[in-house]
Amino acid sequence: MLELTGLTAGYHGGTVLHGLDLSVSAGTVHAVVGHNGAGKTTLVHTVAGLISPSSGSVRLDGREVTGQPAHRIARAGIGLVPQGRRVFAGLTVDEHLRLSYRPPRRGDKDRPSVWTPARVTELLPRLGERRGNRGADLSGGEQQMLALARALLGSPRVLLL
């Protein structure tokens, strides 16, 4: 379960999230909608660890992740597919997948890794066909698929899109 308690955050000196409380149960899908500047991206970036909240907490399965660096939050089980295209132009699709793959570690018994580079390219066959291509050579849609694949390879419990 993802739990946000009293989350307050903002950007450019302004606050857009004011004491937000939210619980997201396992196996559910939620959407956040609102006008420009309402705080949708700030919310996602705060949960993913890209922005530190000014107050409140983010917990994943009861474990505090507030204020941790994004790579630790990803390891804790929160994956992010960025809004814009986020691929490294000089890396091939294969290199992106290897870079993002996180095999299970000892103690990860509760997180079996069902997402492997082979499994991802099986589910997203267009990526499999382009494994040798550089990020700069991919179409916008292919870059977005690659961003999704990279997020899945962390075997996240929560996936932020």
Regions found by a protein language model. Name each.
Residues 151-152:
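ABC ATPase C-loop
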Residues 2, 17-19:
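Conserved structural motif at the start of ABC-family nucleotide-binding domains
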Residues 12, 68, 93-115, 125:
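ABC-type ATPase nucleotide-binding domains, specifically the catalytic core motifs of the NBD
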Residues 155:
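Conserved catalytic motifs of ABC-family nucleotide-binding domains
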Residues 48:
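Helix-to-loop junction immediately C-terminal to a conserved catalytic motif
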Residues 134-138, 142:
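Conserved ABC ATPase signature
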Residues 52, 64-85, 109-113, 117, ...:
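ABC ATPase NBD coupling module
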